[in-house]
């Protein structure tokens, strides 16, 4: 019985496998991808050839990016983006060549939303803060490469913030923006 179920699952997965398209053969027309030789809207897996290897970039649904997309730059830095219906929605991250994450941003329906974090190449946090409805909000903190707080800024949505600066890790000034 288990062998029959396994065989059926293999058959179904082969039968419904998605088409694959090389991105160099596609045209991006306002966020909708078509092939260069026709206007058919695409559904399937998108790849590119990198160092003679097929590298999966992401998935198209109704011609739009959907789900996790990974792009590799010539300097071997990696960018990961999450899309829903062709719009950034979720986590977006850029990585150093070493594989260490350089920054991670969050989007909701194409708008800045949630926690944004940046790191030094040594893995220490560089700065961190949040967005709400596309605006900086709450307390943003900046650190030096050794992990010591350099400055802070408190934001309120659609209002100026208050800067707190540190010198040698000691509070030196608080500046309220007009």
What function would you assign to each model-found segment?
Residues 4-14:
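Sec-dependent N-terminal signal peptides
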Residues 13-178:
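Glycine/tyrosine- and acidic-biased, solvent-exposed loop/turn segments at the edges of beta-strands
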């Amino acid at each position: 019985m288990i062998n029959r179920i396994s065989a059926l699952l293999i058959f179904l997965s082969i039968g419904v496998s998605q088409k694959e398209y090389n991105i160099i053969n596609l045209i991006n027309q306002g966020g909708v991808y078509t092939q260069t030789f026709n206007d058919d809207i695409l559904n399937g897996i998108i790849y590119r050839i990198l160092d003679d290897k097929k590298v999966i970039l992401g998935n198209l649904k109704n011609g739009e990016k959907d789900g996790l997309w990974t792009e590799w730059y010539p300097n071997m830095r990696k960018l990961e983006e999450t899309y829903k219906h062709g719009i950034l929605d979720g986590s977006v991250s850029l990585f150093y060549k070493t594989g260490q994450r350089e920054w991670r941003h969050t989007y909701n329906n194409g708008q800045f939303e949630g926690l944004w974090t940046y790191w030094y190449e040594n893995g220490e946090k560089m700065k961190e803060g949040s967005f709400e409805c596309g605006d900086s909000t709450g307390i943003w903190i900046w650190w030096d490469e050794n992990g010591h707080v350099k400055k802070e800024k408190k934001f309120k949505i659609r209002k100026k913030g208050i800067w707190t600066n540190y010198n040698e890790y000691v509070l030196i000034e608080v500046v309220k923006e007009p």
